[in-house]
C-alpha cells in the first residue's frame, strides 16, 4: 500500500485525530457485539504508547432528525473502550463547541478522548454524510496536523470525519486495521496465489453484479450460492417454484453466465421448504429444479460435495455471502459445508468479506479458522469490485 501509515509519523506530544469504526449493535443501551471496538485497539494503543493524545471519531447508526439521537450516543462505547484499554476515556458528549475544545486542550500524552457520534451532525443539513467543508475543517483544527483513518467500514464513503478531515491536515495516514484490510482483500484479488476461488452468496444478484464481473476476470472459479442462485436458474429456464427471483436481472444473469467461460459454478440441488416461515415440509431437491409450491432456502448436499471438490487445492479463497438462510438451523448446512471446505485446504489464504458471512462464521464457531474477516461489508464489496475507496484515496502518499 503506497500510503503513509501510522508508523510513518511522529506522534509524541501530538493531538492525533483518529477515525475509528465503533458502529456497534446496541440493545437497550448495551453493546451486543464489540468486535469493532476490539479491532481498533492496536492502533489506539500504538498512538498512546508513542505518547500521542488520541482523539477518536466514529458514527453509530443512522441519524437524520433530532428524535433519531435517542439511543445513539457513544457513551456505552466510551465505557467499553475504557475497560478494554484499562484507562479512562474522556467523553465530553458533544461533536463541537467549547466543551469539546476545552476537554481536548486538557489532554495529556497517552490519554484518549472520544467525540460524540459524528452523525449527530446530520440532523442539521447532513453535514457529516455530505462531507460539509466547514465541518471537516473544524474537526481537523482540533488536532496537530495528523489524521489516522482506521475505519475500513466507512472507507467507501466520503464523509466529513474521514475525507473532510484528511483534506485539512498535513498528514493523513492509515491505521493498522485499515492497512490489514487493504492488504488482505486487495492482494487477494490483484495478486492472488492460485488457484483462486471466489464464493458469492446472499439473496440478490443486483448487489453483486460488479463483484461477479470483476472476479470472473481475476478468479479461477466463482461459486454462486444463496438466494441469487434462483435468478441464475430462471435465466436458464430452470423451474424455481416460489423461490426468490429478481425478474429485472434475468438478462444480466444470462449475460454473466455466457461470458463466464465456465468459471461460474452454480449449485446442482437445493434444500427446499413449502414456506419461508411456518413451513411443514423440508426436503432436498432431486436436481436443480425447485418443486411447485416450494422455495429453495439453502444449497443441497450434492452442491456441498461439488463445492468441496471445486475448492480442493485452492490457495486463495474470498467468500462473501451465505449459501442459505443460515440463521435457521434447517438451512445452515450449506454455509457450514462451504466454510469447512475452505478452512481445511492446506496453506490456504481465506478471507471473509464482512457482513452476513462474518456473522455466519462467528455464530457457527468457525471465525478463528479464517486468515482474515473483514470489518466492513460495503467497503469490502467495493474493493472486490475493483473500485477506489474515497477514504483510502484521501490518505497521504508515501
Swiss-Prot record:
- Keyword annotations: ATP-binding, Cytoplasm, Glycolysis, Kinase, Nucleotide-binding, Transferase
GO biological process entries:
gluconeogenesis; glycolytic process
Q: Where is it found, in Gene Ontology cellular component terms?
A: cytosol
EC number(s) in its UniProt entry? Answer: 2.7.2.3
Q: Which domain of life is it from?
A: Bacteria
**What reaction does this catalyse?**
(2R)-3-phosphoglycerate + ATP = (2R)-3-phospho-glyceroyl phosphate + ADP
Which residues make up the binding site for substrate?
Answer: 21-23, 36, 59-62, 119, 157
Q: Which family does it belong to?
A: Belongs to the phosphoglycerate kinase family.
Q: What is this protein called?
A: Phosphoglycerate kinase
The species this protein belongs to is Streptococcus pyogenes serotype M49 (strain NZ131)
Organismal lineage: Bacteria, Bacillati, Bacillota, Bacilli, Lactobacillales
Amino acid at each position: 500500500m503506497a500510503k503513509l501509515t501510522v508508523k510513518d509519523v511522529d506522534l509524541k506530544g501530538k493531538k492525533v485525530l483518529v477515525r475509528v469504526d465503533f458502529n456497534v449493535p446496541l440493545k437497550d443501551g448495551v453493546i451486543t457485539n464489540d468486535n469493532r471496538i476490539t479491532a481498533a485497539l492496536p492502533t489506539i494503543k500504538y498512538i498512546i504508547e508513542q505518547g500521542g493524545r488520541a482523539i477518536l471519531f466514529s458514527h453509530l447508526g443512522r441519524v437524520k432528525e433530532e428524535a433519531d439521537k435517542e439511543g445513539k450516543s457513544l457513551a456505552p462505547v466510551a465505557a467499553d473502550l475504557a475497560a478494554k484499554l484499562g484507562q479512562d476515556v474522556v467523553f465530553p458528549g458533544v461533536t463541537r463547541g467549547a466543551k469539546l475544545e476545552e476537554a481536548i486542550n486538557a489532554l495529556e500524552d497517552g490519554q484518549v478522548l472520544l467525540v460524540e457520534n459524528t452523525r449527530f451532525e446530520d440532523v442539521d443539513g447532513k453535514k457529516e454524510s455530505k462531507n460539509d467543508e466547514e465541518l471537516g475543517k473544524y474537526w481537523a483544527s482540533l488536532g496537530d496536523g495528523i489524521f489516522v483513518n482506521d475505519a475500513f467500514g466507512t472507507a467507501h464513503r466520503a464523509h466529513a470525519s474521514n475525507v473532510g478531515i484528511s483534506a485539512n491536515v498535513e498528514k493523513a495516514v492509515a491505521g493498522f486495521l485499515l492497512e490489514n484490510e487493504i492488504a488482505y482483500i486487495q492482494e487477494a484479488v490483484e495478486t492472488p496465489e492460485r488457484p483462486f476461488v471466489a464464493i458469492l452468496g446472499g439473496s440478490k444478484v443486483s448487489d453483486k453484479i460488479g463483484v461477479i464481473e470483476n472476479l470472473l476476470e481475476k478468479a479461477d472459479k466463482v461459486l454462486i450460492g444463496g438466494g441469487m442462485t434462483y435468478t441464475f436458474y430462471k435465466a436458464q429456464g430452470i423451474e424455481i417454484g416460489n423461490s426468490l427471483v429478481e425478474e429485472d436481472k434475468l438478462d444480466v444473469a444470462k449475460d454473466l453466465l455466457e461470458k463466464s467461460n465456465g468459471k461460474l459454478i452454480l449449485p446442482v440441488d437445493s434444500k427446499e421448504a413449502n414456506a419461508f416461515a411456518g413451513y411443514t415440509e423440508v426436503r432436498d431437491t432431486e436436481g436443480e429444479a425447485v418443486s411447485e409450491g416450494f422455495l429453495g432456502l439453502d444449497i443441497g448436499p450434492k452442491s456441498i460435495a461439488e463445492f468441496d471438490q471445486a475448492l480442493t487445492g485452492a490457495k486463495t479463497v474470498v467468500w462473501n455471502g451465505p449459501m442459505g438462510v443460515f440463521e435457521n438451523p434447517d438451512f445452515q448446512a450449506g454455509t457450514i459445508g462451504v466454510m469447512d471446505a475452505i478452512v481445511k485446504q492446506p496453506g490456504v489464504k481465506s478471507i471473509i468479506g464482512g457482513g452476513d458471512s462474518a456473522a455466519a462464521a462467528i455464530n457457527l464457531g468457525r471465525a478463528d479458522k479464517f486468515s482474515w474477516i473483514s470489518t466492513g461489508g460495503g467497503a469490502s464489496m467495493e474493493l472486490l469490485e475493483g473500485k477506489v475507496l474515497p477514504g483510502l484515496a484521501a490518505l497521504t502518499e508515501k
